[in-house]
Amino acid sequence: MAYTPGSRGGRGGSRGGRGGFNGGRGGFGGGRGGARGGGRGGARGGRGGRGGARGGRGGSSGGRGGAKGGAKVIIEPHRHAGVFIARGKEDLLVTRNLVPGESVYNEKRISVDSPDGTKVEYRVWNPFRSKLAAGILGGLDNIYIKPGARVLYLGAANGTSVSHVADVVGPEGLVYAVEFSHRSGRDLLNMAKKRTNVIPIVEDARHVQKYRMLVGMVDVVFADVAQPDQARIVALNAAAFLKNEGGVVISVKASCIDSTADAAVVFAREVKKMQEEKIKPQEQLTLEPYERDHCIIVGKYLRHQ
């Protein structure tokens, strides 16, 4: 979905969704770059700014997107281990911050008292900036990512989602984060300096042999590479690194695979490609209202099939 921060900024007030909450792209979580969505939308005309703040109330206090009144927030475990729900004025998806006091992309942090009197910090996981968070809120049955898991993350971008995956797997787990873009890779490297369970790899995910010596066997492959040959890229990496019956979680953007076909047709084709690559699809979920024409497909890798 094309989004022009300047032009839509003014609309923030009237549409709420775009400027304020779906402004999770711009307001709620700083969108596709808080600076670009919130910043430019806000700076260009007071109405954009008001849209941010007001949508902010709907989406939670201001552009940062979090819960007001930390004392009243109750943290409950989500059915996916390592993921939590913060219940306050509204319910928010959160992960326990592996590096307390540090935010990665200006996300809201919530501090609560644990039973032993110490403070525990959680980070709000914005579904408008993370396909995995959108999938969890959409009701995925199994994400295979849990405390202690080893994850190969293809298409890590600047590390926004990767940082939350690192929180979920915790200090006993490991995230190998592969990103092709050097610009995004710089942000990824900076994030990994603090999160020591993230191993950043700035390389093309098609060229498995270039990082073969860095990656061990993993429990799950997550892919968000938005390339026409995405299924093949996942298959190459699964063959090299994924254990038998390991999990495969793929985020599919229909327009990146085939911009002329209907999204449902593209998704069905991708499922068929996965089956041909020894991946047994288990569930498929569209990501509305967070992303248009996106879906997540979850499967199990049957190495000896």
Curated annotation (Swiss-Prot):
One Gene Ontology CC term in the entry: small-subunit processome
Superkingdom field: Eukaryota
Keyword Methyltransferase belongs to the record: yes
Subcellular location: Nucleus, Nucleolus
GO biological process: box C/D sno(s)RNA 3'-end processing; rRNA methylation; snoRNA guided rRNA 2'-O-methylation; transcription by RNA polymerase I
Region of interest called Disordered, as start-end residue ranges on this chain: 1-70
EC number annotated for this UniProt entry: 2.1.1.-
Catalytic class of the enzyme: transferase
CDD domains: AdoMet_MTases
Residues noted as binding S-adenosyl-L-methionine in the record, renumbered to the chain: T160, S161, E179, F180, D204, A205, D224, V225, A226, Q227
A single GO molecular function term of this UniProt record: rRNA methyltransferase activity
Record keywords: Methyltransferase, Nucleus, Phosphoprotein, Ribonucleoprotein, RNA-binding, rRNA processing, S-adenosyl-L-methionine, Transferase
Phosphoserine: residues carrying this PTM: S111, S114
Compositionally biased region (Gly residues): 7-69
A Pfam family of this chain: Fibrillarin
Post-translational modification: By homology to other fibrillarins, some or all of the N-terminal domain arginines are modified to asymmetric dimethylarginine (DMA).
Reaction(s) catalysed by this chain's protein: L-glutaminyl-[histone H2A] + S-adenosyl-L-methionine = N(5)-methyl-L-glutaminyl-[histone H2A] + S-adenosyl-L-homocysteine + H(+)
UniProt cross-references to InterPro entries, sorted A to Z: Fibrillarin, Fibrillarin_CS, SAM-dependent_MTases_sf
NCBIfam families per record: PRK04266.1-2
SUBUNIT field: Component of box C/D small nucleolar ribonucleoprotein (snoRNP) particles.
Record-linked PANTHER family: FIBRILLARIN (PTHR10335:SF17), RRNA 2-O-METHYLTRANSFERASE FIBRILLARIN (PTHR10335)
Entry function: S-adenosyl-L-methionine-dependent methyltransferase that has the ability to methylate both RNAs and proteins. Involved in pre-rRNA processing by catalyzing the site-specific 2'-hydroxyl methylation of ribose moieties in pre-ribosomal RNA. Site specificity is provided by a guide RNA that base pairs with the substrate. Methylation occurs at a characteristic distance from the sequence involved in base pairing with the guide RNA.
Family note: Belongs to the methyltransferase superfamily. Fibrillarin family.
Protein's name in the database: rRNA 2'-O-methyltransferase fibrillarin
Originating organism: Schizosaccharomyces pombe (strain 972 / ATCC 24843)
